[in-house]
Amino acid sequence: MCISNYNSDVIARNVKQLGNGVIEVRRYNDGHIRADLSWVWFLCTIGFMFYDYFTTQSIFHDIQWAVDPMIRIEHVFHSYEDPQNSGYTYAGSSFNEFKKEMLELHNYRRYWGAFYILFLLFWFFMVISPKWRPVRFDAKRRLVYFWSWGQLYIMHYPKSVQRDREQLLSFLSPEFFTPWIRPKHFGSLVFNIPHENPNKRSRCVPLGIYRPACEYQNHALLNFILDYLGSENPDEEYGKFFKKEKRITSDYFNWFYQFSLFPQIGYNEKKTEARIQAWLAKNSMQ
């Protein structure tokens, strides 16, 4: 047992205890992808605003062209309207003729306006997207599984390796992965989980929160998972690790990176259990 490699502040932020030997581990991509997209969005927004302020100052007008071009057309028309001949420009063009000419001349600005609107809404799209469904580890039934887009990915490790840490590690074959944009100590713990249908492709699932609760969180998380799965009474022995002791720096980052207007995607317990039982019936292992 390697309890010295992890503590409750790390585990409680990454793992949820469900009871009866089952835990859920959060997905790395919840925060990793949002963090990358959020910073790109933020920097691009600032860049657009500064560029527009010091050059054309046209973003607001372009948005008006996209939302309601008549606002801009009427505004410009009043600037060219002949006070001696209401409804006509100095050049003698009627409002309808002027409108047609302006729509043809500034049609491209409607596309720019639509782009700015969608770009501003991008952040809203991110915050309405729920957090991904976590991966479950069932110590009593010796299962590792998760549900994704109607597909069950499941692994059943043999009883012979459950109490042997090295053999269990060899069977699960986890990996450590760090995206090139991240420092090595901010990496994830990756499990390759087979599809319930052996003829279909397995899924590599990065685990652990981003931003990590500590450096080399992936190593600490692996040690905990191995200890938990190898324990005879995991809920009692490791229950103390599921309660946070204090607030840490990564909490502030993670509130931003993982904020969502909707709760995390959960499991349909009855449907999931039925699929697991059907899979176990076909793939019994002692």
What are these regions (language model features)?
Residues W132-P134, L152-M155, N199-P206:
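Short, mixed charged/polar active-site loops
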Residues S173-N199:
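Hydrophobic alpha-helical transmembrane segments and immediately flanking/interface helices
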Residues A12-I23, D68, E74, Y80-L103, ...:
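N-terminal topogenic membrane-targeting module
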Residues V127-S129, H156, E237-Y238:
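Short, solvent-exposed secondary-structure capping/transition elements
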Residues M1-W41, G47, E196-Q286:
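Terminal and domain-flanking low-complexity segments
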